[in-house]
């Protein structure tokens, strides 16, 4: 009898509407509570360069990613090659101190025909990695091809195409982006890391110390 009475009220239009609304708010509250308890991750993305180095900060909570900072480190005014490396270390350390990232995602140098340019780029990347490891931040490298594939699905995508896709994915205003695409390349590295770590089996193993980096990359210190 009680069950029949309950069913009678349930199928009344007003009662059913109120029941659905209350159920919706209960479920919504549970999801908000779960999201509030999800730990925040801050990913620092870096696009290494011997003249201009791009960096970005990606804030991740659960499955939501948000770009909070985009910028460049301009080393062109420092003409001494060794002092420019020092400047990279100092500036990357400042970014780390300001934003307190949990992880670093950095683009690996590409292999080109100009050996001198490759050497300079490799040094710049190594110094940025050293700055992160000095602050106990795990580092993960991603090849340019892998980053482009993760963002656009095309390993031959241009910098402009990568930037445009990031604007769509992260709802960024293209008119507010830095003119130098090194910044969006850095964001691409960070977003690639976010996607890869969402599927741990596909992610590259991070470097957790300078010794770990040297062990896995002996060719970079010859």
Model-inferred region functions:
Residues 8, 15-18, 24-222:
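Phosphate- and other anionic-substrate recognition elements at nucleic-acid/protein interfaces
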């Amino acid at each position: 009898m009680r069950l029949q009475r309950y069913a009678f009220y349930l199928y009344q239009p007003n009662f059913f509407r109120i029941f659905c609304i209350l159920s919706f708010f209960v479920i919504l509250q549970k999801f908000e509570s779960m999201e509030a308890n999800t730990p925040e991750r801050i990913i620092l993305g870096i696009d290494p360069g011997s003249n201009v180095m791009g960096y970005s900060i990606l804030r991740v909570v659960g499955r939501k990613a948000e770009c909070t900072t985009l910028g460049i480190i301009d080393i062109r005014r420092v003409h001494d090659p060794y002092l420019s490396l020092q400047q990279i270390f100092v500036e990357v350390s400042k970014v780390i101190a300001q934003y307190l990232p949990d992880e670093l995602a950095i683009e690996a140098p590409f292999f080109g025909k100009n050996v001198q340019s490759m050497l300079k780029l490799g040094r710049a990347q190594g110094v940025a990695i050293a700055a992160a490891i000095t602050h106990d931040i795990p580092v993960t490298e991603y090849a340019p091809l892998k980053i482009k594939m993760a963002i656009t699905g095309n390993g031959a995508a241009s910098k402009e195409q990568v930037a445009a896709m990031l604007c769509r994915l992260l709802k960024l205003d293209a008119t507010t982006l830095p003119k130098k695409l090194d910044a969006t390349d850095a964001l691409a590295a960070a977003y690639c890391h976010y996607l890869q770590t969402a599927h741990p089996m596909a992610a590259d193993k991070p470097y957790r110390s300078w010794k770990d980096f040297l062990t896995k990359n002996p060719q970079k210190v010859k």
